[in-house]
Amino acid sequence: MLRKKVTLSCEECHSMNYSTNKSLMSVDRITVKKFCRKCNKHTMHKEEK
């Protein structure tokens, strides 16, 4: 199955902290709660275009 590399960015400060792989079959954007080093707290991170 093919996978695409995507970047996750913080919804508060918009820094791109994480990268992950995503299936090409999924159409939904990834949203995950992760730790942001810039904000120094756990925030929601969403997939960038």
Curated annotation (Swiss-Prot):
GO terms for biological process: translation. It comes from the Bacteria. Keywords: Ribonucleoprotein, Ribosomal protein. GO terms for molecular function: structural constituent of ribosome. Gene3D superfamilies: Ribosomal protein L33 (2.20.28.120). GO terms for cellular component: cytoplasm; ribonucleoprotein complex; ribosome. This is Large ribosomal subunit protein bL33A. The gene is rpmG1.
